[in-house]
Amino acid sequence: MKIGLPRTLLAGLVAIAVFMTGDGFELTFLSKYIVDQGFSSSQSSLMFTMYGLVAALAGWASGVLAEMFGAKRIMLIGASAWVVLHLLFVGVALPSGVYPLMLGVYALRGVGYPLFIYSFVVLMAQTIDPAKLASAMGWFWAAYSFGIGVFGAYLPSFTIPMVGEYYSLWLSLPFSIAGLLICLLMVPKSKGSGNSSMSNADKLRELSRGVAILVHNRQIALAAVVRVICNLTLYGFPVIMPLYLATTNNGGGAWFKVSQWSQIWGFQFVVTIFGNVFWGRMGDSHGWMRQMRWFGCWFCVIGTLGMYYIPQFFGANMVLMCADAVVLGLGISAFVPMGAVFPALALEHKGAAISAHNFASGLATFFGPLIATVLVSTIGFGGVCWTYAICYAIGSLVTFGIHPHQPGFDDRGHRIAAIERN
């Protein structure tokens, strides 16, 4: 466990990386593809928004469902649902050109990946020493980033010029199916899962506690706000940036090709892979909240505005865009301790706290595109980017009200040993 993760869980990281490669295949081009089929930018953004809403609900349910029925079982259910619904989306809904069908099937597919990845977070929380959990979460998010961002972004940049955008959507299936099979064959079962002694009423109460804890625990509520904010651009930029950078819609400049944007986005995720591991260890050593407050929030402010203004002032400058991707990637990955913060704020209800974390994470997939859907037609891409940046600045202030029980630190984020020496 030198890397902070038991060997028995390594297969789970591989499964997540492979599965999320399939899930991330579409992120850098689907919004543009939908617009190219004759739909508006708002209709395209709405599809991602509804997808995010379903993902938020699935994320909320995943933590408690994994505790009740076993993390591996819920992972398999989520992956299977994703594969079936993706087949319906690509094979039936998209070719039909019927927008309500496209919207409905794509939104329903949002149930799949949260059940798959966040159930594994429960398995990690059940297995790993809390003092090492942030480091382990660093590896978890590294695997996630490698899949959804690196392979998921870079591979389409090569397949789209060869087979086009529609057939590139089909190429995501082998990866997601492979991730499902790795989970089936190699991921261990939860030791304390599937508690058959719980009544149906108890199960419903435990599930509802994942949301109720947001009302009754102020610390969890504040952490949820930061959790939503920290990934706004992660899910908002794939919706607006292909339109801003590669088309002339709503004031876009068409500076880059979609394949170039895919490479910029993929490079950002290369940075987050290393950032997730680095920040996971830094958070365990120097304090979770301080890191997110000063590096996470403010790097994201700079990186978010840079994505908009660099093309405005310097045109199609790949070097500067990649440099900005480094800043944004380091900012996003600095929030990696969030997975450890939530259970540390509710030690007596870890399952509900993890569900609240997953719910907030899912809400980011909802609010990121929602901001774009509501604002892009009125204040343009620049206004959307400024909205994201202001949210990050607000998030920095909110962190002052969050005081998790981090091992080795007091409630204000100071090392206990340092205080004792004074």
Language-model segments: which ranges?
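Residue-level signature of mid-helix packing/kink "hotspots" within the transmembrane helices
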Residues: G52-W60, G149, F269-V277, T365-F366
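Cytoplasmic membrane-interface "Motif A"-like loop-to-helix N-cap segments
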Residues: M68-A79, S285-W298
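A late C-terminal transmembrane helix in Major Facilitator Superfamily
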Residues: H349-S377
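Helix-to-loop junctions at the C-terminal end of transmembrane segments
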Residues: G59-G70, N276-W288
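Short amphipathic helix-loop junctions that connect adjacent transmembrane helices
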Residues: F29-S42, V239-Q260
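Cytoplasmic helix-loop-helix junction between adjacent transmembrane helices
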Residues: V105-A143
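Juxtamembrane intracellular "pre-TM" segments in multi-pass secondary transporters
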Residues: M1-P6, S190-A224, A417-N422
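C-terminal ends and interior cores of transmembrane alpha-helices
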Residues: S80-S96, W298-F314
